[in-house]
UniProtKB/Swiss-Prot annotation:
TM region positions: none
Enzyme class, spelled out: lyase
GO cellular component, one term: phycobilisome
Keywords noted in UniProt: Antenna complex, Bile pigment, Chromophore, Electron transport, Lyase, Membrane, Photosynthesis, Phycobilisome, Repeat, Thylakoid, Transport
Similarity annotation: Belongs to the phycobilisome linker protein family.
Protein's UniProt name: Phycobiliprotein ApcE
SUPFAM superfamilies given in the database record: Globin-like
Domain PBS-linker: 243-422, 499-675, 696-873
Amino acid sequence: MTIKASGGSSLARPQLYQTVPLSNISQAEQQDRYLESGELTALKTFYDSGLKRLAIAQAIKLSSQLIVSRAANRIFAGGSPLAYLDQPETDTDDSDLGVSMAVGDASGATGIFGGVKNLFLGSGGGKIPAGFRPISVSRYGPRNMTKSLRDMAWFLRYTTYAIVAGDPSILVVNTRGLKEVIENACSIPATIVAIQEMKAASLDLFRGDREAQETVVQYFDVLITEMQTQVPNDKLRQRPSIDAQGLQLPQSYFNAAEKRQKFVMKPGLSALEKNSVVKAAYRQIFERDITRAYSQSISYLESQVKSGDISMKEFVRRLAKSPLYRKQFFEPFINSRALELAFRHILGRGPSSREEVQEYFAIVSSGGLAALVDALVDSQEYADYFGEETVPYLRGLGQEAQECRNWGMQQDLFKYSAPFRKVPQFITTFASYNQPLPDQHVYGSGNDALEIQFGAIFPKATRSPSASPAPFNKDTRRILIHRGPGINNQLGNPRARATQPGSLGAKVFRLNNELPSGKTTNVSFSESATQKVIEAAYRQVFGRMVYAGQRQKVAEIKLENGEITLREFIRALAKSDVFRNTYWSSLYVTKAVEYIHRRLLGRPTYGRQEINSYFDTCAKKGFYALVDAIIDSKEYEEAFGEDTVPYERYLTPGGYSLRQTRPGALREDVGVKVKVEKTARFIELGTSSTKNLPVTDVDARLKQGVNIQRQQTKAFKLTDTFNKVELKTAIAAAYRQIFERDIEPYIVDAQFTALESKLGNREINMKEFIEGLGCSELYQKEFYTPYPNTKVIEMGTKHFLGRAPLDQQEIRKYNQILASQGLKAFIGAMVNSMEYLDNFGEDTVPFRRFPTLPAANFPNTERLYNQLTKQNRDLVVPSFEPAVKR
């Protein structure tokens, strides 16, 4: 087993401290029950006193400098401790909290100066511990003075945190064990005196408010007690195994973690308490309370364990051997997965090593479920942790130290969804430790974005989850493919880092405003070249062109004027709010570092050593320092210099394969070269073909060259006006034919209600309805007034005859009518023509007829119908050829 193994990158959020709501609700959740009256009362008291506790914390916060100063004056001598106190950051208006600050009104002080006077002239906070002596400021040193005052401010701030949380857990976790640390740097008696003085100063703020003073005393006393407590011993993991990792958990982590109740079966327990212990055993073995959820139980075993005939250890053994357990957790799984679930149920953990899996796999393979259960229950580990009376429990994060080699799988095993995963996780992960390193990010495959141009797209861990380990050590370097000649790889040939990739790599943009001759400068050439470089910079940094409002106009102007270099322009883009919000604020730090590194430096990160340095920069200095570290690096200077837009220099093997056609992943009938079978010429000549025969059918001649739209054309014919659905359909078709769009109801109500009523009452037919639409004000406004007569004639024949004008003779005919008699006479001439009656009759809505004779009219009709309404004013059938401009 390698010592560099890592069991995946499963995310864990350890609990940092306890609160009243969390403590009460977690106990009820562990026992799968509703909150009891005592827990509800505790929650009610917590929320009722919430405003009071917030007011206390706010009052202490406002006077924190005075309180710390008073404590410092008490333990330091020979100087001014206030000079070493860091000024707190100015907060926004405190009234935003909505907390009334009416505290300390009953004191004898008047105004703020009275409060300051009470703070500095108040009495001590308690009995002075033995060994206390004031500390000389000059001998203590400025550095130690600053640290001591900072620590006192921390103690005061953590006290306010505990007051707001309603639980002293945060004080216990953060101060227990500090005694030895403080003794090495300062003095425990002096620290106790300082805390007592801060306690007394805080009490002076609440004179006359007994409840507030009791709250302050409670939490300061806890702080003083914990400061005097010896450093607790770490919790060691108990396992007499030669292949297990030696692990220990700091006591502070255990104190901060969720409290997991231990259920112990004692002979003197009441019947109700024994029932709760039995239910806890059901929840551990079957992962649910089977008596409550499914009305199932093993009654004879329950009676035996309650009466003391068998111990809890035997009860667990028989539950795990029961037919119910076999049916749910053994038969549906293969042996390796059943072994993992049995470890969770009986020992409260997952398998620890490959050797352990092999040992118990041999047992379950030879003896079945019964032998596996006996081996686990009779093990020394079970006896050390649970003994004869304790119900097994999950030994997860916070209960004891966790191993790194099975970290991800164990976190998944503790989830409620574990029985739904059929594939074994532990044995496959342990086996992968001896395999070559995978082609993935060193901190998990989910941190590698898809290597595409647009955006940062990362694979989701919730879809096809994989906790496969990636045991990369700090010296491991990822395999990267150079986009360019292989001889210019920067690892094998560092001097070729500045060499451009040529045709084998990405296109390179350089900012150079001078012409190759170097004698003259073309202004327009310079401006266009600069704009191209700016666009390339946006595409490289953001992966796309940003919106006009997101462009960095000031930086662009400076670059065009030569005030900044292209390198500084790239820095300005990377530090913009748009880039920060898109690729920093919305991503986890590791993902953000990886993506920003690819955008600014043109390659993925190499390994843990490089990422850790960037991570340290982000943690200590923030986002802008990360951008500066990348752009100011020697690699950036050598690869791009001051005048080159960063480009993609390296790819991962996964990204390279993503951009390639992968024939191996395609079906046999896809991606295969098509072989054309050639037919012998004498066979072609001897085969009869209809294409060589003369076409004598007139209908076939008429239909040649006409697309499928002719068969798909639907003619709307109004035959029954009493059918309201048919009437509305025909009217809507008429609107679309004449106006080339649907007409809004308010326009219909204003202009066409009378026409529709007459059509519905059979006072007019469809032909007269069409003529009325053409003579309306709306048609005149849209198709007559804005256009010349020739264009009006084209649109009129399209709307009322379903074709383009036949020839110039027809255009002259309608032009005379239109010029002498107006629009209504023009429309009447078309609607009352014999052509209209032959094609549409009295009751059919006009439609496109696809006329093929004369031959010149068919392409004109195609152009007229394929041209959108009001798209342009060009004539489809011009009266003369346009003159060519010279």
